[in-house]
Amino acid sequence: MPIISSFAKKLGFCLILLAGPFSFGLSTPLLAYPFATIVLDAATGEKLYGQNSNTKLHPASLTKMMTLYLTFREVEEGRLRLDQRVLISKNASREPPSKFGYKVGQKVSIRFLIRAAAIRSANDAATALGEAISGSEAEFANYMTRAARSMGMDSTTFKNANGLTASAHLSTARDMALLGRRLIYDFPEYYHLFGRSSVVSLGRTLYNTNRKFLASYSGADGIKTGFTSAAGFNLAASAKRGNKRVVAVVFGSGSVKLRTRRMTELLNIGFAKASSSSRQNRLPPLKLSKSDDLNDFES
């Protein structure tokens, strides 16, 4: 027994050494998932800190940020209306949880689908939005990937509208931070939705999957949680204090509690380093058509 105890202590000490400390005070648990972080100055786009931020990982429901971005774009450009009702397909109705629970043939307005996807992280709502925009989820995934390329998200490929694990459906912490920044500045009239603790959709109160973090971190007003067994617990977040706004992404946490702690540490780093200037570097217009060839962005 003493020999076993001594060996266990030595093994534990070696694992601690191998784990190593993160710089800037980030917590240091042994990692169950591939892990990545980044924090940007939202006004300038400057990277303030990051680990493995260009590593391709599973984005899980952070995917819905792009689904919603393109939905907002379709509404703004007049191709969709918020009160427009769309037919729920068999494909959308069969999506696994988390979901709203729409029935095949049910008609649901774009407004309510947006609320369910953004707040409840409903997979069926995200799929229905993609089908409403592009006719099929596969075509919409191609549209999402083209949009990613146009935004400079060079390491992202989408295969569905909701983020369920699929071969080659991958992104990076950097790319998702760029997308978060786009949501904030391209659609301020819709971005506020991500900061709400709850919404009503079809007579049901939907609670924000991110509400505990929003309540716990001063200035936090978004953006999106994500989880799958392949990804771990992901979070894209933004917060504003005074003239400073930062955007941060965490991939691969082992629990909600750990994700919250890491994001808190990351945003604190961001606010310590971000510029106090309120001047925002203008984002270039998104040049994108649903008919564009993906190869045009990869040449």
List each language-model region with its residue ranges:
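Active-site-adjacent loops and short helices of periplasmic peptidoglycan-processing enzymes
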Residues: 21, 25-174, 184
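Alpha-helical protein-protein interaction elements
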Residues: 14-16, 41, 61, 150, ...
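Short alpha-helical segments used as structural interaction elements across diverse proteins
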Residues: 6-7, 61, 256-259
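Hydrophobic alpha-helical segments, especially transmembrane helices
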Residues: 10-11, 65, 241
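N-terminal secretory targeting signals
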Residues: 1-36, 40-43, 48, 79-81, ...
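N-terminal start-of-chain detector that recognizes signal peptides
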Residues: 9-10, 59-60, 86-89, 149, ...
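Enrichment for repetitive, rod-forming helical segments
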Residues: 16-17, 71, 266-269
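Domain-terminus/edge residues, biased toward the C-terminal soluble/receptor-binding domains
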Residues: 153-157, 165-170, 174-299
